[in-house]
Amino acid sequence: MTDSKYFTTNKKGEIFELKAELNNEKKEKRKEAVKKVIAAMTVGKDVSSLFPDVVNCMQTDNLELKKLVYLYLMNYAKSQPDMAIMAVNSFVKDCEDPNPLIRALAVRTMGCIRVDKITEYLCEPLRKCLKDEDPYVRKTAAVCVAKLHDINAQMVEDQGFLDSLRDLIADSNPMVVANAVAALSEISESHPNSNLLDLNPQNINKLLTALNECTEWGQIFILDCLSNYNPKDDREAQSICERVTPRLSHANSAVVLSAVKVLMKFLELLPKESDYYNMLLKKLAPPLVTLLSGEPEVQYVALRNINLIVQKRPEILKQEIKVFFVKYNDPIYVKLEKLDIMIRLASQANIAQVLAELKEYATEVDVDFVRKAVRAIGRCAIKVEQSAERCVSTLLDLIQTKVNYVVQEAIVVIRDIFRKYPNKYESIIATLCENLDSLDEPDARAAMIWIVGEYAERIDNADELLESFLEGFHDESTQVQLTLLTAIVKLFLKKPSETQELVQQVLSLATQDSDNPDLRDRGYIYWRLLSTDPVTAKEVVLSEKPLISEETDLIEPTLLDELICHIGSLASVYHKPPNAFVEGSHGIHRKHLPIHHGSTDAGDSPVGTTTATNLEQPQVIPSQGDLLGDLLNLDLGPPVNVPQVSSMQMGAVDLLGGGLDSLLGSDLGGGIGGSPAVGQSFIPSSVPATFAPSPTPAVVSSGLNDLFELSTGIGMAPGGYVAPKAVWLPAVKAKGLEISGTFTHRQGHIYMEMNFTNKALQHMTDFAIQFNKNSFGVIPSTPLAIHTPLMPNQSIDVSLPLNTLGPVMKMEPLNNLQVAVKNNIDVFYFSCLIPLNVLFVEDGKMERQVFLATWKDIPNENELQFQIKECHLNADTVSSKLQNNNVYTIAKRNVEGQDMLYQSLKLTNGIWILAELRIQPGNPNYTLSLKCRAPEVSQYIYQVYDSILKN
């Protein structure tokens, strides 16, 4: 009889009966009872009251019964930790059982019971099992160490289990080696800078020896570990590749992808002119092709990985394009991936085959697939110049089919072809215009409008065509509205006498009737350009456009290198780095391909080289955490040469001038928009006219954010340093408005505390504020909250919440903030300095090991020393004062009478600063050593230390 009978009972009083059966003297009865308990537990019934009775059943030699009891324990131990202690003695006893299966089962179960109270009892049995004579027990114990580390990392280190794991790498049994490697790899994920695996040529040799005899999953663990190793020279890299290459013919696709990952990384170290390099490239193709004969799901994963490989090394699969031709029964997700790879492999040699395939795909029934096929024809035209004419001809044939979505997609790609090959295929415009009425998608309408505007001089009725789009202007998408505005301005510049009324109509619609700030601003820019200098307008709007690139959807090179290091994992399927989708992944070690260094001796540690590579390859599209680091590595000047203006504290950058009325809803300079002639009077007198047509969008914060910001308490952290208020904008420079202020950090939020004083003879209203781009992306979270008029001689205090989600630009000095304030009188500009302590975040405390590894990892030339003079505080007071400002003391030592404080802090943009503060009792001068990856920040951190400790 099957076990399904255990799931069918619905009797009342079942728990009482089970309790009696669990205490029955007959083994078979007890076993049946435990099965019923497990069945009840499986369907969601609460059988926790039977805990003591089930635990009593542990005392048995029957392996099946033991497994069932252990399953029950794992499920209920967390909710009944005190009861779980009852089972400890049985576990310890089972760990010494003569049967190795029972020993392994006991140690595995103890590792799965995530209860702190039990972990301390687990140490002794685990230590014995790690040295057990049976390899099955040792391999199980190795995994248990990783589980224990997840519960209590400190205990694992204190008990020396990490050393025991390292010893297992030299074990005679390959599965023990594989599990030890897997456990160490997982532990090192949470300690990215600690060289736990200690990869050196001797250990690598042991791993390669074990590789041949492992199970398939053991091989994956070992291959993933090998991919983190950086060989000393190309000879060692070649030797490893030779021993890994046989894995390419493995039946398990995961093993194949792990082997491909190792070889792709080590290819970077091999000289490109060598015979072995070319032979290895040839060997990589067949296994990748074989992966495409599996299940659709396996094919999809393989194709996503192949997409990365083709972007990195297209020569591997350049002869295999036919493999990626779509089969009629492929699922849509496989079809789309194959199509993408086909385009990447398209070349002059195979373009005829590719185009024939694509034309066939464009007649299929699946709309998404057809769209992508039509788009692919356009990409072929752009990528392979010799095929452009044939591609255009194919697209025209498809347009003649009059299938709506095919026509629309074809028009979108023809626009790109016009951009790539100007003045070459414009003869087809007439055919395109015939299909104008059938266009209903924003992309297609925008593409057609762009074509009409760009080639208006060749189209007799261009004004009529654009006017037809203008009739439903407010119903169009933003993309179409912006394109139509630009197209009509182009038309006006080419045929001014015939289209004056049309351009005034579109400018009026864009600036007066639209709620979209982007559209309004572009309208004002064109309006001012046309009214002040039509010649310049022509040069700007009708300027020669840069040619579009061949591949617009390539993954950015640094990210591609990182994804190559994650072949075979979820990152390679998402095409995103792990830290983009793994929760709490800030500690995940970012991987990069090794740099070819010939035969020089670079350290064996994968950590050192990886970090160096990370520094040398700043991200092109940085995450918020890396923005400043990348800016500091680049020699960025200001974007424009700003002339100094004597009446201001800084070079006048037009933060608000170009579109303040439209952005903030007020009228400066008397009714802008009524006539282009008044455009010039809109520019503040202190701002050079050069900057007028460059408005910065106003910060629009959501109502929800506003509620959160306003709900934060006023109370500050005890002892948190606040710089005294300074006058930022004197009344003499702001027509009677005086602004003084400072910055504070309280309850995890940054505030700009300001005092507005009206020293003029008239009241002030309509206040608004905006920041220029700055080094830390600081912007207001909410609009300026001054809701009542500021009367003469009246003052008002304002607390403005800030965040660091704005655009970033390196300033000089680094903490400089340029501010524009507008009221009913004028727009005023001032600059102030942000004390960096308000940018210190609460999670700036590093673990000791991470601190030590990071300190060693940062180059010595990044270390800067400063003297803090005339400070009479002891080490504890210093530590306490700094902690109130989110500077955390990691460790304190006394060396030869000197107190040494080791501290860490973190800025809002993710930059870590490590500090060593030396305090000599009786000596009022302290020595501060600072280390960080962006040493330009250190000077400002020192200033903050000085201010905090002296106030």
From Swiss-Prot:
GO terms for molecular function: clathrin binding. Keywords: Acetylation, Cytoplasmic vesicle, Golgi apparatus, Membrane, Nitration, Protein transport, Transport. SMART domains: Alpha_adaptinC2, ARM, B2-adapt-app_C. InterPro entries: AP_beta, AP_complex_bsu_1_2_4, ARM-like, ARM-type_fold, Armadillo, B-adaptin_app_sub_C, Clathrin/coatomer_adapt-like_N, Clathrin_a/b/g-adaptin_app_Ig. The modification 3'-nitrotyrosine is found at Y574. It comes from the Eukaryota. The keyword Acetylation applies. Adaptor protein complex 1 (AP-1) is a heterotetramer composed of two large adaptins (gamma-type subunit AP1G1 and beta-type subunit AP1B1), a medium adaptin (mu-type subunit AP1M1 or AP1M2) and a small adaptin (sigma-type subunit AP1S1 or AP1S2 or AP1S3). This is AP-1 complex subunit beta-1. It comes from Bos taurus (Bovine). The lineage of its organism: Eukaryota, Metazoa, Chordata, Craniata, Vertebrata.
